[in-house]
Amino acid sequence: MPHFKFYYFDVRGRGEAIRLLFHLADEKFDDERFGMEQWGVLKSEMPLGQVPVLEIDGVKISQTTAIARYLGHQFHRAGTNAVDCARLDMIAEVIQEFMSSSGMGKFSRVLLGMIQANKEQFFKENVLPDVEKYAPIVEKFLLENGNNGLLLGDRETWVDVFAAESFSKLIDYGSPDALDAYPHILALINRVFNHPNIKKYVSQRKATPA
């Protein structure tokens, strides 16, 4: 197995799904967390001048979905054929689009105080409209897979983890009832976060502001 080193801020943000994939697979990695001051030094060392970044035996890979997809294949948490892999990529693109949408894309910066706004009001006025646009799409994919709490097949894939982490932040940082209208997404979150390996990690994970 390669030596993995993962670079991201000391928050969940866009990096937590990557950490969860390592814990799901029970694979060791160096979890390099840092603040803004240290980031000023590290930035020039990153391929695109941004994080998350995964270093694999000295080779750095950037972009959340590229890293998650690689780990999905590395840990046998991807599709078993080309069509299934393409379907997972399709769903991942929807999740990534949601995370980069006008409201959700700014919400972490609001939580961290980088954008001055009332958190509750911003969530209601800017994030919930994004949820109403994208959550029904993911809900449909989950229902089409047989209502087993997964997006494809009967075993957690990298996209299940990516989606569960992305949507769970709506409840953890936004509103407890943010996903009440989407029972299949709630079932996905419940299934992923109750996997023994992930459950153990989350039980020991420190709270972060975003």
From Swiss-Prot:
Q: Does the keyword Transferase apply?
A: yes
Family annotation (InterPro entries)? Glutathione-S-Trfase_C-like (IPR010987), Glutathione-S-Trfase_C_sf (IPR036282), Glutathione_S-Trfase (IPR040079), Glutathione_S-Trfase_N (IPR004045), GST_C (IPR004046), GST_superfamily (IPR050213), Thioredoxin-like_sf (IPR036249)
Gene3D superfamilies given in the database record: 1.20.1050.10, Glutaredoxin
Query: Where does the GST N-terminal domain lie?
Result: 2-79
User: Is Iron one of the keywords UniProt gives this record?
Assistant: no
Q: Offer an example of a GO molecular function term for this protein.
A: glutathione transferase activity
Binding-site positions, glutathione: Y8, W39, K43, G49, Q50, V51, Q63, T64
Q: Which GO terms describe its biological process?
A: glutathione metabolic process
- Role, per record: Conjugation of reduced glutathione to a wide number of exogenous and endogenous hydrophobic electrophiles.
Which family does the record assign? Belongs to the GST superfamily. Sigma family.
Name the record gives this protein: Probable glutathione S-transferase gst-36
- Natural source organism: Caenorhabditis elegans
In the record, what lineage is assigned to the organism producing the protein? Eukaryota, Metazoa, Ecdysozoa, Nematoda, Chromadorea
Query: Source gene?
Result: gst-36
